[in-house]
Amino acid sequence: MPCTWITSDLQLRLILTLFFVAECLSAGMEGTKTSNNSMQQLDNGNHSSVSTTSSTERKQSTVTLYAEVKTSLSVLVDTKAVLTCPPVLWPSVLVVTWEIVLRDKPPCFGAYRRDTNQTTRGNCTDKRITWASRPDENPALQVDPVAITHDGNYTCQIVTSDGNFHHEYHLQVLVPPEVTLIQTEKGTAVCKAAAGKPAAQISWTPEGDCDTEQGPYWGDGTVTVQSTCRWGSRHVLNVSCSVSHLAGNKSLSIQLSQGAEIPAHLKNLYITAPIFIILIVVGSIWLLKISGCRKCKLKKTEHTPVVQEDEMEPYASYTEKNNPLYDITNRVKTSQVLQSEVDGMNLHTIYVPRV
């Protein structure tokens, strides 16, 4: 790539040099011819010699004419830019060249030669940079669409029979930033102008205690600016963020949920109140648990004798089931006692014990 650029550059400069030499030779020949005519006319009369010499001086001074103009041009990204050459009389044009120097790229050349009606390009690979129309009609340059990478210098040089004319453009590509406005949990407002070129400026309405920071530049030349604003104890409900930029101004508004930041004593109250409530609940549960355990212990102590009596009942039942003769003997004795009582009452009853 560097070799190609050097070769193209040398070719273009060689063309220009040839035209300059040809122009100078032409001017020299005209001067010599005029001088000879002047010498012949000098013999015929002094007045004619003075007139011819003055005409030659005017011609030579016109050939050495040199004009240069510099212009700074700002163009919005993704639009069309047309760069024009210096206004000159077209019949006198010999060569038109464009030199393009972009950021981090080698120079690019484009040329048009009028006598042969030919165009050449050297090291120009960007197809978005072209002639605006036919170079034999209008040698203006066109960039469509404009990208961030088109930042740089564009120079049009026209070589004419009357002299050289330069017009240099310093092209700056503008990128509008993306503007956002939000409210944080701390009661502050944050306005951000992201990925703008060049850096944007941020202002607030109403004014407050604001802190504006500019981030680092990205590889494409864009930068982000962020402003954080707070209003302290002032009762502010609505705020506006205004972003000023060469690509256009923008303003956003937001309604704050709280006009001022929460005081310190209220913050402490909001923190300690939940903790205090949790302690009360935990303490109440602990007290209820202790009182419940005490009641359980008292109930167990009161029911202890009953439990012992109940524990004896299975043994008694076991004795009864395993000693049926003991039960019959008791029934016989009971029957005899009842019989004696009946006899005492003069009642005769026949009792038959059950076997």
From Swiss-Prot:
One of its GO terms (biological process) is regulation of neuroinflammatory response. The chain crosses the membrane at residues 268-288. Residues 1-26 form the signal peptide. Residues 289-355 are cytoplasmic. Residues 139-257 form the Ig-like C2-type domain. It is a single-pass type I membrane protein. Residues 35-55 have a biased composition (Polar residues). Residues 35-56 are annotated as: Disordered. Keywords: Cell membrane, Disulfide bond, Glycoprotein, Membrane, Receptor, Signal, Transmembrane, Transmembrane helix. Residues 27-267 are extracellular. Belongs to the CD200R family. PANTHER family: CELL SURFACE GLYCOPROTEIN CD200 RECEPTOR 2, CELL SURFACE GLYCOPROTEIN OX2 RECEPTOR PRECURSOR. Inhibitory receptor for the CD200/OX2 cell surface glycoprotein. Limits inflammation by inhibiting the expression of pro-inflammatory molecules including TNF-alpha, interferons, and inducible nitric oxide synthase (iNOS) in response to selected stimuli. CD200 and CD200R1 interact via their respective N-terminal Ig-like domains. This is Cell surface glycoprotein CD200 receptor 1.
